[in-house]
Amino acid sequence: EEALPQITVIHKDLLEDGWQNSFEGADRVYHIAADPDVRGSARKSWEVYENNVSATVRVLEAMKEYDVKEIVFTSTSTVYGEASVIPTPETYSPMIPISIYGASKLACEAMISSYAATYGWHAWVYRFANIIGSRSTHGVIYDFVQKLRANPTELEILGDGSQSKSY
């Protein structure tokens, strides 16, 4: 944040009020807030919907209110579901998510697309796979790292080795 003084990072709960005026004078919004828990999304489907879809609509409404015409959105490769084409191109269809999380991010993409078309905005959507960071608690990369820490000479891979991913 200090290295890029022209960027304002908003550390707020997007489901609450009070952050919207931060968009005043902004040229572009980078919407990276989300509940990224694919595995846990089945247990807390309403919470995932609120934190992803409702929060995104609130961002879009604030953009409309403050006349911000560009949005960059971080989505996920889980919007593709069980893709039959590997590697999976961005134009792959139909997108049939198999997780609540993937469905919520696809709904966000649809809302962003509709707002952009309706209000003449520009939107960029990036579909990332296997995002990891210091607060990660699970996932394939996290599991690999934990297994290698436990035994640096051997990496146990689950499954029969025939699985493939688009990355």
Please name every model-derived segment.
Residues 11-51:
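NAD(P)H-binding glycine-rich loop region in Rossmannoid oxidoreductase-like domains
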